[in-house]
Amino acid sequence: MPPKAADKKPANKAPATASKAPEKKDAGKKTAASGEKKKRTKARKETYSSYIYKVLKQVHPDTGISNRAMSILNSFVNDIFERVATEASKLAAYNKKSTISSREIQTSVRLILPGELAKHAVSEGTKAVTKYSSSTK
């Protein structure tokens, strides 16, 4: 049976003027004075927005993009990434390997993307891996 209203103790609430938005503090300063609670740092939201924007400016320097369109493209990239990673994981499991290599990624791209799009994606991916390999030597 729940306690009656008379039995409840009043909760210590923040003043009504306090907003729910986190206060702006210096990220480097963490103070734990007596009685003060530590502020939880805001979780970072990782997106592909900056990379999408850079590619847009390379292709169409005078064109902008709305926040909604950026959000849609970000969801699209996340979806394709997840599909390729899942397929590559399955391919590695079929071949009894515990490591996903560039070969599994390439095969999964060929399986997921249709026709000409897969060919272009594979060639761009191969070019990127070659460029990375030559720069690390």
Curated annotation (Swiss-Prot):
Monoubiquitinated to form H2BK123ub1. H2BK123ub1 gives a specific tag for epigenetic transcriptional activation and is also prerequisite for H3K4me and H3K79me formation. H2BK123ub1 also modulates the formation of double-strand breaks during meiosis and is a prerequisite for DNA-damage checkpoint activation. Residues 1-10 have a biased composition (Basic and acidic residues). The keyword Transmembrane does not apply. There is a cross-link at K131 (Glycyl lysine isopeptide (Lys-Gly) (interchain with G-Cter in ubiquitin)). Disulfide bonds: none annotated. The keyword Nucleus applies. GO terms for molecular function: DNA binding; protein heterodimerization activity; structural constituent of chromatin. The modification N6-acetyllysine is found at K8, K9, K13, K24. InterPro entries: Histone-fold, Histone_H2A/H2B/H3, Histone_H2B, HISTONE_H2B_site. There is a cross-link at K8, K9, K24, K25 (Glycyl lysine isopeptide (Lys-Gly) (interchain with G-Cter in SUMO)). Keywords: Acetylation, Chromosome, DNA-binding, Isopeptide bond, Nucleosome core, Nucleus, Ubl conjugation. It is found in: Nucleus; Chromosome. Residues 1-45 are annotated as: Disordered. GO terms for cellular component: nucleosome; nucleus. It comes from the Eukaryota. Core component of nucleosome. Nucleosomes wrap and compact DNA into chromatin, limiting DNA accessibility to the cellular machineries which require DNA as a template. Histones thereby play a central role in transcription regulation, DNA repair, DNA replication and chromosomal stability. DNA accessibility is regulated via a complex set of post-translational modifications of histones, also called histone code, and nucleosome remodeling. The nucleosome is a histone octamer containing two molecules each of H2A, H2B, H3 and H4 assembled in one H3-H4 heterotetramer and two H2A-H2B heterodimers. The octamer wraps approximately 147 bp of DNA. Belongs to the histone H2B family. This is Histone H2B. It comes from Podospora anserina (Pleurage anserina).
